[in-house]
Every structure is written in structure tokens, then in C-alpha cells.
Amino acid sequence: MDYVKLGSTGLDVSRICLGCMSYGDPGRGAHSWVLNEEQSRPFIKRALEYGINFFDTANIYSSGASEEVVGRALKDYAKRDEVVIATKVHGRMHPGPNGAGLSRKAILSEIDNSLRRLGTDYVDLYQIHRWDPNTPIEETMEALHDVVKAGKARYIGASSMYAWQFQKALHTAERRGWTRFVSMQNYLNLLYREEEREMIPLCLEEGVSLIPWSPLARGRLTREWGEATQRSQTDEFGKTLYAKTAEADRKVVERVAEIAAAREVPRAQVALAWVLQKQPVAAPIVGATKPHHLDDAVAALSLRLTAEEIAALEEPYVPHEVSGGLSARI
């Protein structure tokens, strides 16, 4: 396993981050396709055996069950000081006022709830899951700074927002002398490259690492175009990401298949290798629900695409509508 520094920090993270949205309780939350605890634990254990030390979850995943499953597995299989646990705040955790968002009340309540579910007294990376247009960014950044100073988080990160919003947050923290974001968990893959326009140049300039979610486009880059899975058939959010660009996306998927065939490797390795070679990507967030998912992710670290292959993969791309959770409302 290869390791890199996260952003401009001294924190070492594996070049693959295990995304834990697929682990939890199928009966809790919005996704019936998630694995239960018994099914999830072998993937977390296998990731550790591969040298993966970076694990990403969120309070909203499986209504908190993901954090519970991840916390118990890591406690059983690893030493706390040897793993990097990342979680997120923003999503609705209870109905009514103050049940979601990035107010001081929500952040200070939810960090304690996440720590309790994870069974730890701190997280390594505490991320805001989305931008909150209903809370002043000064309130959010000060609350996050206080979380760090209280020892409940080592670093903070952000996810899925416009570049101008991220710059505003960075500027606010710098101007006030508060803790600064070190990572951006954004939506980036061969089927969606709009982040190359503003967010990636901003992160390069500011020394912020990318930890992209959905690097395999929810599996679309790994299988035949017409092939369906339980998740692809029931994942309503996923359908909204790709419904309008199907014909253009098909050409990219076919190009991935061609290069994978020429290299004699699975398509997932080609798609992940492309993300891994993007700067300033530290670690793509890879979900694993089958044993070969982790095998392919780790193998992708050794696959170096040529400039010609990268050009061939990128050539069919057409501009997409901005998506990936970027919206004006909670």
C-alpha cells in the first residue's frame, strides 16, 4: 500500500479510502441495498489486511448504523492510532427544527453522537457533507474550529459544494485564525469531470487534497452498458446523476472497456487509475460489496496509464450539468 500526506498536513493516509456507505442496516435509512453488520465486517478486515488505513462514513449513512458497524469492526481489528476515521455532518438526523444543517447547535450535537456511535473519543477527519445556505459560514467554521480545539477531531474537511463556496470557507477560516479545511470530498470520475473547471485548480492552489466519491460512477464504468445491479435499479440519487447524459457516457464506458481489454485488466482498475493520476487526488473513496472490489482497487495503484491512454479516455467527454449534491437548499 502507498501512503500520502493529506493536504498540507502531516497525516499519512492510504491511497485508497474505504467508503463505508454500503455498510450498516438495510432496515435503517434510505438504502435497502446496504450490507448488514455480519456482511460488512469481512470487507473492513480485508481492507486493513491490504494496508488501507483510511475509512470514510457519515452520520446520515443508514441513519447512524454505518458509524456503529465501522466503529465496532475497527475496534476489533485495528489499533485506534493506526487508522484514520473520517465522518461527516449535515444530513437530517431527526425531524423538526435543528435536525440537519451546519448550525453550531447541529455540529456540536452531531460530533458527540458520531463519537458515541463510532466508539471513539475523536475522529481524524470531520467533514461537512454539503454547504448549508441557511447558516452563516462564520458560525459553521467557528463551530468546527471548536470541535478541533476540544480534541474531538484532528482535522476538518468539506464535500460537494461550489468552488466559490469552498473558497469563502477557506477565506473565513484564514481571516479569523480558525482551523482550515484540508480535504475536499468531491464528485469526480470519467463520466463527470466538471470539477476540473474550478474546484481542482482551487485545491491545487490552496494545498487541499481531493478524496473523490463515486470514482467508478456507481459501477457504471466497470460493467457492460446495459447491465444492471440491485443498486443501479433502486438508487434514485444515482439515476439523477447520469440520466441526461447516457449517450455521451456510453462512449466513455466503451473507451474504458477497450483500454482494459488491451491491458488485460478489469475495467475498474482502468477507471480508478485515471482518478489516482489526477492531481491533487490523495485517495479515491471506494465502496466494496464484493471481494474483487478491494482487489481491483489495490491493483489500480500499480496501473500507470500512458498519456495516450488518458487522452483516449478523456476524448469522448462532453460537458455535463453541474450535479453531485450541489444545491442551494438542505
Predicted regions span which residues?
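N-terminal binding-site loop/beta-alpha segment at the start of enzyme catalytic domains
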Residues: 1-83, 330
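Conserved, mostly hydrophobic/aromatic
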Residues: 6, 18, 40, 55, ...
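Structural preference for beta-strand elements that scaffold enzyme active sites
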Residues: 13-17, 53-54, 82-86, 122-125, ...
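Terminal-tail/helix-coil boundary detector
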Residues: 1, 41, 205, 229-262, ...
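Glycine-rich beta-alpha junction loops
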Residues: 89-91, 162, 188-192, 214-221, ...
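Aromatic-lined glycan-binding groove of carbohydrate-active enzymes
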Residues: 194-231, 266
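Generic structural signal for well-ordered alpha-helices
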Residues: 44, 67, 71, 111-115, ...
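Glycine/proline-rich, positively charged
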Residues: 26-27, 92-194, 198, 205
